[in-house]
Amino acid sequence: MILRLTPAARGDLRAIFREGVRLFGEQQARRYLEQLGKELRFVGDFPQAVRLRDEFYRPVRVHRFNAHIIIFDIVGDEVVVARIRHGHEDWKAD
């Protein structure tokens, strides 16, 4: 499947990196983003491994990675990552 990040998800990645640099330093922020990239590849390769959450307005799949969650859907032959949010945020409102 093709992995596609929405503009909002790309913005989330930039924000995660900036916040990581501020809190933990650039080297650690880069490592975290590399690990997050591996999780995104997993989601792209095995999207069906993540349970569909149908309790929301629109059913989505939610995959946890450390402090963050990857919110995505399968659309045709694409895995579309809508957002990458911190697990403590009110991400259900978006």
Which sequence ranges carry the predicted segments?
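Short proline/glycine- and basic residue-enriched helix-capping loop/turn segments at helix->loop/beta transitions
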Residues: G44-D45
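Amphipathic alpha-helical segments that line or abut small-molecule/effector binding pockets
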Residues: E34
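Basic/aromatic recognition patch in beta-strand/loop cores that engages polyanionic ligands
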Residues: Q48-D77
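Arg/Lys-rich, positively charged N-terminal/basic patches that mediate binding to nucleic acids
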Residues: M1-R31
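Enriched for short, Lys/Arg-rich terminal
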Residues: A67-D94
